[in-house]
């Protein structure tokens, strides 16, 4: 699985810690991590939580990522922004049990974490435990066991509902403010990470032409 890490500007200084912790957990499982930044608070490409949502939508809908890890100060804004896009099911995780239950019950493809709120001593330990519970036990298996059937049924229903209530990502890219879009994909390593991994020719061609 290809996991993309996105950090918005208010918590950009924590990107190295988050990346290191994520890689420590998921690379031994056979997963790949692509770090889309921000890398420091002074990056030329300033990603807000709204841009983090747009970038998550681009990565997941193009197939350039299978999963997105993002967040903001509280995680709430990033979650809302991510869920405004098609093909993105983003959960808000604050502890390891959230990670396990989101993976098993909701079976989403994106998570938003609080990187300021309650992020003090031992923060990297909590992150490590969250990532282990999120990625270490498969997805969509249900929890508790007696709730597996209705949970899996509801997940399929939610996917069908989102397909109806959201527009195609390529249409959004055409209609969204183009300056905002260009800023979102102007990260230092966006091109080298995104275009080789992109599986949607229309999305890739449109972004490359900007």
Description of each model-found segment:
Residues 14-29:
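Short, solvent-exposed amphipathic alpha-helices that sit
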Residues 15-16, 53, 75-81:
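Short glycine/serine/threonine-rich phosphate/pyrophosphate-binding segments
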Residues 77-90, 94-95:
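Short Gly/Thr/Asp-enriched flexible loops that form oxyanion-binding sites at enzyme active sites
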Residues 38-39, 73-74, 97, 115-118:
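Short, ordered loop/turn segments at secondary-structure junctions
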Residues 65-71, 90:
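A short, small-residue-rich loop immediately preceding and capping a beta-strand
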Residues 29-46:
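A short beta-strand-loop structural module common to alpha/beta enzyme folds
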Residues 4-17, 100-210:
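C-terminal binding/interaction regions
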Residues 48-67:
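Short, structured active-site "lid" loops
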């Amino acid at each position: 699985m290809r996991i993309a890490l996105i950090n918005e500007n208010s918590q950009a200084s924590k990107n190295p810690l988050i990346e290191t912790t994520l890689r420590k957990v998921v690379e031994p499982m056979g997963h790949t991590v692509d770090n889309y930044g921000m890398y420091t608070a002074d990056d030329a490409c300033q990603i807000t939580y709204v841009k983090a949502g747009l970038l998550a939508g681009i990565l997941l809908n193009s197939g350039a990522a299978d999963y997105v890890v993002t967040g903001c100060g509280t995680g709430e804004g990033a979650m809302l922004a991510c869920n405004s896009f098609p093909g993105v099911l983003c959960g808000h995780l604050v502890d390891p049990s959230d990670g396990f239950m989101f993976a098993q019950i909701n079976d989403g493809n994106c998570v938003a974490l609080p990187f300021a709120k309650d992020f003090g001593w031992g923060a990297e330990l909590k992150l490590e435990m969250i990532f282990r519970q999120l990625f270490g036990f498969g997805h969509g298996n249900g929890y508790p066991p007696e709730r597996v059937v209705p949970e899996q049924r509801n997940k399929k229903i939610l996917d069908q509902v989102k397909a109806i209530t959201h527009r195609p990502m390529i249409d959004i890219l055409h209609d969204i403010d183009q300056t905002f879009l260009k800023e979102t994909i102007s990260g230092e390593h966006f091109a080298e990470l995104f275009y080789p991994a992109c599986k949607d020719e229309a999305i890739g061609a449109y972004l490359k032409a900007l």
